[in-house]
Amino acid sequence: MRVMAPRALLLLLSGGLALTETWACSHSMRYFDTAVSRPGRGEPRFISVGYVDDTQFVRFDSDAASPRGEPRAPWVEQEGPEYWDRETQKYKRQAQADRVSLRNLRGYYNQSEDGSHTLQRMSGCDLGPDGRLLRGYDQSAYDGKDYIALNEDLRSWTAADTAAQITQRKLEAARAAEQLRAYLEGTCVEWLRRYLENGKETLQRAEPPKTHVTHHPLSDHEATLRCWALGFYPAEITLTWQRDGEDQTQDTELVETRPAGDGTFQKWAAVVVPSGQEQRYTCHMQHEGLQEPLTLSWEPSSQPTIPIMGIVAGLAVLVVLAVLGAVVTAMMCRRKSSGGKGGSCSQAACSNSAQGSDESLITCKA
């Protein structure tokens, strides 16, 4: 049995690793399902993605030409055809179950058949450093709002409203929590251990962040200091700003950790400071890939800062030079045209412009 859920709220076989296996930190496996109804355009679309830690390893899309579970990581591609056939059938059963649930939910909320609605689920397990279940999850959301969730005890449910209480009574009558608990404590943990072993070069690596602090003047009186962490894995990281040793949490702008597109992550934290007091502020960073926490501060550049008015003046000069260049080119064209070579100058100008553009693009790509 498999289960899943949202942020606003998807494996039978033994893992082959002993319970004595240990890791430096905890690990997780999550399945995220989304079913979206689309009245007048066929059956609801169902998409499921699976993650081990921060790495996607499987995907299913009911709208695919040939819907099947698709590997998204090299270490799961080694699973045989029986595995993929079995997983595909589970996805298809889950898709059908979600279609029924969408119809039921529309009735619970007394909604018409005309609108589109969304059902999301997340399920999975966390594995502790001792190789045992740390926590299990099964949560659902409807139209972007929390609906029902399995509690941490893995024995009871929390319903968000009276409609969800209908579902809760059905789940309790079916003793669904017991089945989920067996899955989370057994199958989920066993497969997570297996994936961690098969993909250990990727999943159990720790890449430290590349760090620096940038300075962005806002006015004569204030500036923004931004502390950057780039190219790190896993995604869990802590960034904080301090002023004279005191946390500036309330005054810090902190973005969500973002994927970099190459399997690593990036994040930054920013704080607005009075000009001239930058050295009183320090950025503090903690990550699994660091031997010890880092403390960073802004290092003023040895190059002079160009004031805004200077930049504007420089741009104005460039514009004037560009205009003068165009005038000179036009005059040269007229002279050549008077000598019976009218088209060649225009063609040459286009050719030179194109070559310059190509070189620029090549440089950017490199």
From Swiss-Prot:
Outcome after substituting D33Y: In allele C*02:02, allele C*03:02, allele C*03:04, allele C*05:01, allele C*08:01, allele C*12:02, allele C*15:02, allele C*16:01 and allele C*17:01
Covalent S-S links between cysteines: C125-C188, C227-C283
Annotated effect of mutating T187L: In allele C*03:02 and allele C*03:04; requires 2 nucleotide substitutions
Annotated phenotype, changing M331V: In allele C*01:02, allele C*02:02, allele C*03:02, allele C*03:04, allele C*04:01, allele C*05:01, allele C*06:02, allele C*08:01, allele C*12:02, allele C*14:02, allele C*15:02, allele C*16:01, allele C*17:01 and allele C*18:01
Cytoplasmic topological intervals: 334-366
Subunit structure: Heterotrimer that consists of an alpha chain HLA-C, a beta chain B2M and a peptide (peptide-HLA-C-B2M). Early in biogenesis, HLA-C-B2M dimer interacts with the components of the peptide-loading complex composed of TAPBP, TAP1-TAP2, TAPBPL, PDIA3/ERP57 and CALR. Interacts with TAP1-TAP2 transporter via TAPBP; this interaction is obligatory for the loading of peptide epitopes delivered to the endoplasmic reticulum (ER) by TAP1-TAP2 transporter.
UniProt-listed SUPFAM superfamilies: Immunoglobulin (SSF48726), MHC antigen-recognition domain (SSF54452)
Positions of region (Connecting peptide): 299-308
Domain of life of the organism encoding this protein: Eukaryota
GO molecular function: peptide antigen binding; signaling receptor binding; TAP binding
Name of this chain's protein: HLA class I histocompatibility antigen, C alpha chain
Name of the encoding gene: HLA-C
Modifications the protein undergoes after translation, according to the UniProt entry: N-linked glycosylation at Asn-110 is required for efficient interaction with CANX and CALR chaperones and appropriate HLA-C-B2M folded conformers prior to peptide loading.
Domain statement: The alpha-1 domain is a structural part of the peptide-binding cleft. The alpha-2 domain is a structural part of the peptide-binding cleft. Mediates the interaction with TAP1-TAP2 complex.
Annotated consequence of substituting L10I: In allele C*01:02, allele C*03:02, allele C*03:04, allele C*04:01, allele C*05:01, allele C*06:02, allele C*08:01, allele C*12:02, allele C*14:02 and allele C*16:01
Mutation effect (V272M): In allele C*01:02
